[in-house]
Regions:
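Acidic, glycine-rich calcium-binding repeat modules characteristic of RTX/beta-roll
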Residues: 92-94, 207, 292-305, 323-334, ...
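Acidic, Ser/Thr/Pro-rich low-complexity intrinsically disordered segments
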Residues: 61-152
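Disordered inhibitory propeptide/activation segment of secreted metzincin zinc metalloprotease zymogens
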Residues: 2-39, 158-211, 262, 273
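Metzincin-family zinc-dependent endopeptidase catalytic domain
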Residues: 137, 160-187, 214-342, 349-358, ...
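Pan-zinc metallopeptidase signature
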Residues: 77, 364, 370-467, 473
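Acidic Ser/Thr-enriched surface turn/capping motif at secondary-structure junctions
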Residues: 3-7, 14-73, 111-126, 148-150, ...
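Acidic glycine-/aspartate-rich tracts in secreted/extracellular proteins
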Residues: 91-94, 110-111, 145-148, 199-201, ...
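Low-complexity acidic/polar repeat-biased segments
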Residues: 139, 156, 450-452, 457, ...
């Protein structure tokens, strides 16, 4: 894409897109996704010796800080003999606090020198590739070149010969010190004028060509977008025409010079009326590469303008490559870290397939994940961008734009949103989707792989799945997630979420707070996890797990299994034949209709069988068991339990009633036919409702029977009954 002009100018990025302007799919091919490990943070200063307490594993990132120019940080890592590894250190993009020129040293187990690198990575960052000769502990020694700098850095370790950068490190590669439109980096607030150039040849004497109407429209659209997403403001001079009286000017020329377009970086120091030279920020399009007619989003030409405006905003290429006539640059030979592709930044030369994204997507529709992070580092974020309740995808708030998946059938984008209660709507898709509402995570949208992300700092609250087997991950906000049709897997994450699986057999996990979950149609698995959750199974046979917290579980239709987990839970089986398990806590179990199994668990539980022939098992604790209608079997199962009966209770069995335990009782207070001990055991000439039948006692209540297994009539007394 880009080349530095032959008479080097540090403010110029001249871009040659011809190497990428080939039929889609001609890139390296669908590459594998790279593994990302843990991110470790230096809290106390790392020792500059083998006594360091910091250690990282392969695929981890270590985020450190050189507190002074002379500071050195050592980090241990275990390597395997014969395996090739690449180590990299880069600044983190925090311009006033980032180490701009880190130096990397690799040391053996005793601290002896193995190798060093300075500037082997992008820009002035460092990278080493090494094949371990012995298995064991090695040390990565991070310092600044010639003890000349301090500040934050990121350190990575991966297998193979290409480094891996996390977002902070990658944003650092896009930024250059003192190349921004603001005097105070990160605060924004400046207004920069721009215009469509009226006249004037290129700096190297190429004949000026006015922008076509389509080029003007695309430029205006992208500049309005750039104005909206950052703390920097742009004002067009003479919006309906042209002008040469603006800080940033857009012009065109036509020449086969190997450059598809080029742009100048912002200035570095104040001076003159605006503080910048005449060239800084200017953009030139080469009409031999950039279309004058077809500049819709996703096209090469639209993307070219987006890329050049990135330079005009202060973004550099992520690697040390600059194309021109006769120069061949490939991902295999030129990319210095794995994430240097269009999947992460519009400033890359390389197709997104190199980092694992599906082919056939075209070019990025928006700034991408690392671009947003870098731009917001320079100018601050824009909290008013799309600040209403915005829908992205189908039924989009902004119809006909890149955010409308009816119009944009091959989305390759990152979404930044300032405020409001927002939704990603995938309801128009029939294939499986993976959508993460977490910032900085790649999603698989529209049948493609890794083509969608949510920018850092953006919060999207809600999601609507499609008709395929979707996987949707929530975030820490209070999410509302609708799975739609298909066998979906939905994870709520943090926040008090509302999740509805919709049709088919879904798996739903509420996450860390109190959630409201609906299974809908299909045999669903619903897990509340942490928090006080309310869960409705819906139709068909569901598995409902409350997890921790005081949960309310409703099986509704179908042969359901409900497990309360820890906490004081309420379980209602609903219709059909259900199994309810209270586990820990003082639980309430309601079987509802059907032949149900209720098992109380460890504490003092209330079990109500409801209609049907139920089995109630109390477990440990002082439980209350009421079989309800139907022929029920009740087991107190340890301690002193109470068995409750009312009219029309059916023919019930108590398997483990202990007549000798004065704290275990049969409660007839809701039974109209037996009102006293005499009614049960008889007195004088009275007829007893209870009789000995073999080893058991059978009590005839008039509307049913109660069989006390292995109980002697003579052992029953007033302490065994409540009237």
């Amino acid at each position: 894409m880009c080349m530095i002009c032959s008479t080097f100018n540090p403010f110029l990025e001249a871009c040659d897109y011809d190497g990428l302007n080939a039929p889609l799919g001609d890139a390296q091919g669908d590459g594998p996704q790279f593994a990302l490990g843990n991110t470790l943070v230096e809290v106390t200063d790392a020792a500059a010796s083998t006594a360091t307490t910091y250690a990282m594993a392969v695929n981890d990132f270590f985020m450190g800080n050189l507190s002074s120019n002379s500071d050195r940080d050592w980090v241990a890592v275990d390597l395997v003999a014969g395996q090739q590894y690449t180590f990299a250190v880069a600044g983190t993009g925090a311009l006033f606090d980032s180490n701009d020129d880190p130096f990397l040293t690799l040391r053996d187990a005793s601290g002896g020198l193995i190798d060093t690198d300075d500037d082997g990575g992008p820009g002035r960052y460092s990278s080493l590739t090494f094949t371990a000769t012995v298995s064991g502990t090695y040390y990565l020694d991070v310092s600044s070149y010639n003890a000349s700098d301090s500040g934050t850095y990121g350190l990575s370790v991966v297998e193979g010969n290409r480094a891996s950068f996390n977002s902070e490190m990658a944003a650092g590669t896009l930024l250059r010190p003192d190349q921004a439109w603001t005097a105070v980096v990160g605060e924004g607030g400046e207004t920069v004028s721009w215009a469509i150039r009226a006249s004037g040849n290129t700096p190297d004497g190429q004949t000026f060509v006015p922008l076509s109407a389509a080029q003007v429209a695309a430029t205006q659209s992208i500049m309005a977008y750039v104005d909206a997403i950052s703390g920097l403001s742009f004002s067009q001079v003479n919006p309906s025409g042209t002008s040469n009286s603006a800080t940033i000017l857009f012009g065109a020329y036509s020449n086969n010079d190997g450059a598809g377009a080029y742009a100048y970086f912002p200035g570095s120091t104040p001076g003159g009326s605006r503080g910048f030279t005449a060239l800084q920020g200017d953009v030139w399009l080469n009409n031999t590469s950039v279309s004058q007619n077809n500049l819709s989003f996703g096209t090469y030409s639209y993307y070219t303008i987006l890329h050049e405006i990135g330079h005009a905003m202060g973004l550099a290429h992520p690697g040390d490559y600059n194309a021109g006539l006769g120069v061949s640059i490939t991902y295999a030979n030129s990319a210095q870290y794995m994430q240097d592709t269009h999947q992460y930044t519009v400033m890359s030369y390389f197709d997104e397939t190199n980092s694992g994204v599906s082919g056939g997507l075209g070019y990025p529709d928006t700034f991408m994940l690392h671009d947003y992070l870098a731009l917001h580092t320079l100018y601050g974020a824009a909290p008013t961008y799309h600040s209403g309740d915005t829908v992205y995808g189908f039924n989009a708030t902004y119809g006909g734009t890149v955010y409308d998946f009816t119009a944009n059938t091959t989305p390759l984008m990152s979404v930044y949103d300032g405020a409001g209660i927002d939704t990603i709507d995938l309801s128009g898709y029939n294939m499986a989707q993976y959508l993460s509402l977490e910032e900085g995570v790649m999603s698989d949208i529209g049948g493609y792989f890794g083509n969608f992300s949510i920018a850092y700092g953006a919060v999207i609250e809600n999601a609507i799945g499609g008709n395929g087997n979707d996987t949707i991950d929530g975030n820490d906000a209070a999410n509302t997630i609708l799975g739609g049709s298909g066998n979906d897997v939905i994870l709520g994450g943090g926040g008090s979420d509302t999740i509805d699986g919709g049709d088919d057999d879904d798996e739903i996990y509420g996450g860390s707070e109190g959630d409201l979950l609906f299974g809908g149609n299909g045999a669903d698995t619903l897990v509340g996890e942490m928090g006080n959750d309310t869960i409705y199974g819906g139709n068909d046979a569901d598995l409902i797990l409350g997890g921790n917290g005081n949960d309310s579980l409703f099986g509704e239709q179908g042969n359901d299994v409900l497990r309360g987990g820890r906490g004081d839970d309420f379980l209602d089986g609903g219709n059909r034949n259900d199994r309810l398990y209270g586990a820990e806590g003082d639980d309430t179990l309601l079987g509802g209709n059907g032949d149900d199994l209720l098992r109380g668990g460890a504490q003092n539980d209330l079990m109500l069988g409801g209609d049907g022939n139920d089995v109630l098992i109390g477990g440990a604790g002082f439980d209350t068991l009421d079989g309800g209608a139907g022929d029920d079997i009740m087991v107190g199962a340890f301690n002193a339990d109470t068995f409750v009966f009312a009219d029309d209770h059916g023919n019930d069995i108590i398997e483990d009633f202990e007549a000798a335990n004065d704290f275990e009782r049969i409660d007839f207070s809701n039974l109209s036919t037996l009102n006293s001990l005499a009614d049960v055991l008889g007195s004088g000439s009275g007829t007893a409702a209870a009789t000995q039948v073999g080893l058991d006692v059978v009590i005839d209540t008039g509307s049913g029977t109660i069989t006390l297994l292995n109980v002697n009539y003579a052992d029953l007394d007033a302490a065994d009954f409540v009237f």
